[in-house]
Amino acid sequence: MTTGSALYIPPYKADDQDVVVELNNRFGPDAFTAQATRTGMPVLWVARAKLVEVLTFLRNLPKPYVMLYDLHGVDERLRTKRQGLPSGADFTVFYHLLSIERNSDVMIKVALSESDLSVPTVTGIWPNASWYEREVWDMFGIDFPGHPHLTRIMMPPTWEGHPLRKDFPARATEFDPFSLNLAKQQLEEEAARFRPEDWGMKRSGTNEDYMFLNLGPNHPSAHGAFRIILQLDGEEIVDCVPDIGYHHRGAEKMAERQSWHSFIPYTDRIDYLGGVMNNLPYVLSVEKLAGIKVPDRVDTIRIMMAEFFRITSHLLFLGTYIQDVGAMTPVFFTFTDRQRAYKVIEAITGFRLHPAWYRIGGVAHDLPNGWERLVKEFIDWMPKRLDEYQKAALDNSILKGRTIGVAAYNTKEALEWGVTGAGLRSTGCDFDLRKARPYSGYENFEFEVPLAANGDAYDRCIVRVEEMRQSLKIIEQCMRNMPAGPYKADHPLTTPPPKERTLQHIETLITHFLQVSWGPVMPANESFQMIEATKGINSYYLTSDGGTMSYRTRIRTPSFPHLQQIPSVIKGEMVADLIAYLGSIDFVMADVDR
């Protein structure tokens, strides 16, 4: 199934004000305060007392905002450029909503005072609000009355304080030296003990006693430091509780202590298999703040390298997924093919997994001599390899038996849980940002959006394999139609600046020195950019207070909601089905935990 048989999605229109008119007609214009931003969507402040009513209205419109795309907070207490903020806004909770049928977004914000950090839960409107609200409580200490289980999610249960508050230290040197004596070790071990009653689970049923099984956090099929506790009746999964946070490194906190430029390498480590794909939403969002329009050559280079990393990520997924269901050989072949891709990536960027190669206003350097030959060798090689994987593995009756009909969900369920990427398109929903909301010039390329219909573990795999074929088509078009021109924008905030801007007189040299050492000064505003990353939609929501560092960096990753969905999908299936399901999600814990 391809784009021709799917639901019509209208052309994207940034800052679409239709929903603002509908809200004003329903609640009156005095109920909202608009904030001018560079996020590309309406941003509206609403009183806390009206919040649930407003969000319910948006969820139930004729063309509803079916997805709670993101929910998080901001500590506004140290913000100096407060234009657009309500008076007394010490903290903000924001709700980013997405409508497929409108192909538009809206952001609703609530201002909170430090003395009253509480906002009603919206888990009754969107089930995926649960983990987001837990993270906001964990990071900021904001309470959500009515939440079914408001506990730590990123930090350990014994942690003290809320790390994303501005008064919480950002460097290890600001803490006392860490020590772990026997008593503290026993305390931590006891805190990690799973108690079924805490999660509303019974230890026994009418005629049976349930077994509780820890899968992870170091199980090979958990794909990283991920723990999931299973409530079992024999081999059948009665219920389960995913437990995340073991890979949390405080990436959003780090962004507050790095310059706009020096944070780029940290983005590589979010989805550590995505390479420059991680750089892209960040630099695009910074460029919105700066007002930078990059040359066509930069756009095309960025697209080509992003699609290379889509292929390398999908190849690793394919090999490990097939290995999870019992076939041991294909993973060695997929890793060999990844090496061929990395040969090209390393020749162009100088690095393999984590190039940190995109720059604010361009890329680190121009394409090397002979790059076309390397790219052509790869795109000539890969199609026949994908054909072999199809015949040898994906058409295999055992693999089909293990995955067809397993862990299936439909489009409605996917949207309610915030599922994006191949997981959403495997249900038949044709929503790929490269087509629906083109960025970086994707509208100039010819490619199809692979779809499936059943939303099961097999379809998720098939969609990704077809996506690799489409990525090869895009790379070939980049190779054949690479524009001439500079690899950096001629803009004062391009970082590092073009050398021509530095060699005019002493002032330009000083400007260059300050911009490289301290970092560029970005205008005070807010910006946002989402992209179709390897594992789904990835986005950066940046807040600048007019300085050399981000005031707040919100990183929304696709894998976080994908893991939250697990219990709703896998209940009633077997443990072996869970292994196939986990493999079909395609996640890494760095992408979940940040």
Swiss-Prot record:
Sorted UniProt keywords: Cell inner membrane, Cell membrane, Membrane, Multifunctional enzyme, NAD, Quinone, Translocase, Transport, Ubiquinone
Organism: Pseudomonas fluorescens (strain SBW25)
GO molecular function, one term: quinone binding
Lineage: Bacteria, Pseudomonadati, Pseudomonadota, Gammaproteobacteria, Pseudomonadales
Domain of life: Bacteria
Main location: membrane
Any Pfam family hit: Complex1_30kDa
Top EC category: translocase
Protein name: NADH-quinone oxidoreductase subunit C/D
Record localization: Cell inner membrane
Membrane-topology annotation of the record: Peripheral membrane protein
Region spans: NADH dehydrogenase I subunit C: 1-185
Quaternary structure annotation from Swiss-Prot or TrEMBL: NDH-1 is composed of 13 different subunits. Subunits NuoB, CD, E, F, and G constitute the peripheral sector of the complex.
PANTHER family: NADH-QUINONE OXIDOREDUCTASE SUBUNIT C_D, NADH-UBIQUINONE OXIDOREDUCTASE 49 KDA SUBUNIT
Catalyzed reactions per annotation: a quinone + NADH + 5 H(+)(in) = a quinol + NAD(+) + 4 H(+)(out)
GO CC terms of this entry: NADH dehydrogenase complex; plasma membrane
EC number: 7.1.1.-
Family the entry assigns: In the N-terminal section; belongs to the complex I 30 kDa subunit family.
Residue segments, region NADH dehydrogenase I subunit D: 209-594
